[in-house]
Amino acid sequence: MNQTMKDRFALKAPEGKICWQVLQQNMSQRCNFCPVSKLLRDPSSNKTIHWEEVNSKTGRIYENHDSLINWFDGSIVHLQQSIDITDSKKAFHDACFDELTNTLTRRAGKELLEKLIKAAHQNCHGFITCMFDINSLKQVNDNYGHSEGDKLIITICQTLKKYLGSGDIFFRLSGDEFIVVFTE
């Protein structure tokens, strides 16, 4: 374990300890998401299992790469390489989701719409696209303030999201303009 990880988990000497005892919170046995059992089913396969976890001790997100290796004494041991991807995930989320409405941003929405159009052409299926804006938003902002205008936008978005299917796309095109794509 490198020093950065020791510092992040506030560990002095974790070497030789079982991972769930030092890297997880309130665990009394191997984690239910641990891939060791899968790896042990065929220890000679040399496969690596890739997965993500939100760590129970730090709350950070890790991309894990687990495999079994032959140790210097001939035993087979579990090796896990973990990369903290929390900041990358946050940056990706911030780039793709509008901070006010938590809908897709213009760029992310348009990219998904392009993919949907290509898939629709290839698979000969249709969809419905709806563009709408919020009438009188300027008057709400002028008369009651931008915080009330923001509340109006948020309420409309939250209400609409309740009626969307899992394959539908909803994104903010600009200030008060939105696109909804119904796929089902």
PLM feature spans:
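Short loop/turn elements at sensory-signaling interfaces that couple input to output
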Residues: G59, N64-H78, T86
